[in-house]
Amino acid sequence: MAITPRPPAAFDASRQSYGYPRLTVELREQHEPVGKVRVARLMREEGLRGRPPRRYRPQTTQSDHDGAIAPNRLAALPAITARDQVWQADITYLPTAAGWLYLAVVIDAFSKRVLGWAFSASLATDLVLAALEVAVQCRGGQGAPGLLLHSDRGVQYASARFRALPAAHDITPSMSRRGNCYDNARAEAFFSTLKLEHTYRRRFADHEEDRRSTFEWIEAFYNRRRRHSALGNQSPVDFENQNN
């Protein structure tokens, strides 16, 4: 079977993001007898270049407010060994020609799956509420025994309105230490991947275009197709199915 044409097709299927290690795994699952050295050579010949990850740079959150601060319960966990043990919540901004669009997500720390997301033109508490509601519905409308919801100390997560929603589903809140965003590194790493592989590769004309495109990237590609080396080169959904 000729393999020379296959790397470009597999590369395009990765949204032109895979380097040779993940592309090798992709081709092997398509029953191509290739090794990393050969795939690297074929990529050079075709002029294909993946999107290398950027070094994680934490950004602190303004936490000077009167909201309730939960203790950092995540720090006391020896390890995360199952899904629905820890969810991590965070907010980022996406640039468009019409101004900033804000994205809130809830991520399963075990599988890296984005369970919930919401978009807004403002940083109102409704944004993080909507993302958590989607995550809860993704898991059948309820939390799990002992589930932690970890976030930074942002005013949205500390508000009384937000705190009522985890409490209603028996989800225990946890918050990062002041000025220490490494506590929420999984969510920050997701945002870095999103911006590098998707957001910064095009210019969105308005909020609606960005919403549609980012939703499709998260749900159709990131959750279900994108391979993660930390997950044994599986997608988050495949990793959950294997470890359910």
Features from the language model and the residues they span:
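Charged DNA-binding/catalytic regions of mobile-element recombinases
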Residues: 1-244
